[in-house]
Regions:
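Short beta-strand elements
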Residues: 138-163
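Bacterial N-terminal signal peptides that target proteins for export
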Residues: 1-9
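Short flexible loop/turn segments that cap and initiate beta-strands
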Residues: 54, 58, 66-97, 128
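Exposed beta-strand face motif in extracellular beta-rich ectodomains
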Residues: 124-130
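Bacterial N-terminal signal peptides
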Residues: 8-17
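Aromatic sugar-binding surface patches on proteins
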Residues: 103-116, 122
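Beta-strand-rich domain onsets/edges
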Residues: 23-61, 65-68, 158-163
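Sec/Tat signal peptide C-region and signal peptidase I cleavage site
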Residues: 17-23
Length: 163
């Protein structure tokens, strides 16, 4: 009797795991990205070079790659949107496309958006997060490290202009 009960209990437990295993797996997204200075006419640059400190009237560019759980690039056929949300609440929609965008043949494809820092914007660190939305309206958010020295920072001064 005891061995039959144990066998029945084991069968029920195994069937319970089989049912749980057939559930849809959670689809996770993975984010890669950086911040660079976006070119603005008559500014000297350097452009498309990693930095986290920007002066007013310079343009911050976010370069973002989103990967699916299989490690494949999640482009605009996989994601409905990618949005950068600044710490002050501004939302900047990113676009998927080739880079460089003009001139030379593309070397890469990723999501990007740029924002020109207003002349009167306060100095200091400015947090942000990146929100990817899948076609089924599922959102996933990524945020950089929260230590002030590694955050996007607006610093005093004017951008250098070409002479």
């Amino acid at each position: 009797m005891t061995s039959r009960f144990c066998s029945a209990a084991l069968a029920v437990a195994v069937l319970g795991f089989v049912h749980g295993a057939s559930a849809q797996p959670v689809k996770r997204l993975f984010f890669e990205g950086d911040l660079v200075r976006h070119p603005i006419e008559n500014q000297t640059g350097p452009f498309c070079v990693l930095t986290s400190q920007f002066k007013r009237n310079e343009a911050v560019a976010w370069r973002i790659r989103v990967l699916d759980s299989a490690g494949e690039v999640a482009d605009d056929k996989v994601l409905k949107s990618v949005v950068v949300e600044l710490g002050d609440g501004q939302k900047l929609p990113a676009h998927f496309g080739p880079h460089p965008a003009r001139g030379a043949p593309p070397t890469d494809y990723f999501w990007s958006v740029h924002w020109v820092i207003p002349a009167d914007y306060p100095t200091g660190s400015l947090g942000y997060k990146v929100i990817a939305t899948t076609m089924d309206e599922t959102n996933q958010t990524w945020e950089p490290f929260k230590r002030a020295p590694s955050q996007l920072t607006v610093i005093a001064g004017d951008p250098e202009m070409k002479k």
